């Protein structure tokens, strides 16, 4: 689901993941507000729909450590195949029982764990943001939940002037949430600014942070 762009070849790219079972619902409406703003800033965008097919949770089989791919060959592997070409990510979700949609949780659990165990480093130092859509409540708990994937993966988290949420029962409702849509536009501009700063830093020869071998310490030994 590619957004229409008129951008230069080689432009930086942000993948926006729609974690809703509704491909063109409230979450999509918020993501498109961001996508259009990113395009205006010269950033290419792609909407990735996780779809409505059942997505299994991680079964800790460690197949990803051996093959670099999840043992369940579905939308997770399709996403990981294109993630390397992205410069930034946005993950959008509706609120279900004051938390993220179950399918998106399974999707992100497996995507991020596969990346960790395989050593592919598809997300390392790439900016990320989450977008949350609700009819009424549960948004901040869901916002915190999704951000935890980024902050355990060395991904700079992009913020806006308010927590990244929109409200509405239908896409038409979301379009009336003027503050929510403004929050999406500011979020997109902040991400575009960060991407341009990162690109300028790399071109200027600013080195990436020194890497350390990861140390694991179990609480109970």
Regions found by a protein language model. Give the residues of each.
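Cysteine-cluster motifs in flexible loop/terminal segments that predominantly coordinate metals
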Residues: 53-80, 216-220
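Helix-loop-strand module that forms the ligand-binding subsite of alpha/beta enzymes
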Residues: 71-162
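A short beta-strand-loop structural module common to alpha/beta enzyme folds
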Residues: 44-53
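Glycine-rich phosphate/pyrophosphate-binding loop and the adjoining helix
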Residues: 156-221
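Short, Lys/Arg-enriched N-terminal segments with co-localized hydrophobic residues
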Residues: 1-11
């Amino acid at each position: 689901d590619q957004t229409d762009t008129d951008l230069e070849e080689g432009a930086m790219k942000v993948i926006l993941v729609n974690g809703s079972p509704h491909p063109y619902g409230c979450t999509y409406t918020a993501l498109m507000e961001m996508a259009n703003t990113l395009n205006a800033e010269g950033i290419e965008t792609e909407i990735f729909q996780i779809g409505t097919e059942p997505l299994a949770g991680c079964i800790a089989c460690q197949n990803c450590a051996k093959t670099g791919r999840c043992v369940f060959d579905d939308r997770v592997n399709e996403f990981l195949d294109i993630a390397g070409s992205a410069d930034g990510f946005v993950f959008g979700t509706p609120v279900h029982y004051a938390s993220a949609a179950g399918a998106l949780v399974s999707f992100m659990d497996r995507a991020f764990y596969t990346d960790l165990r395989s050593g592919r480093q598809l997300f390392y130092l790439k900016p990320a943001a989450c977008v949350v859509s609700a009819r009424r409540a549960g948004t901040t708990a869901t916002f915190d939940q999704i951000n935890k994937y980024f902050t355990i993966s060395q991904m700079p988290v992009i913020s806006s002037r308010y927590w990244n949420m929109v409200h509405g029962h239908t896409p038409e409702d979301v379009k009336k949430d003027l503050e929510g849509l403004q929050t999406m536009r500011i979020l997109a501009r902040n991400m575009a600014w960060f991407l341009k700063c990162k690109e300028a830093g790399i071109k200027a020869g600013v080195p990436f942070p020194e890497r350390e071998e990861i140390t694991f310490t179990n609480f109970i030994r």
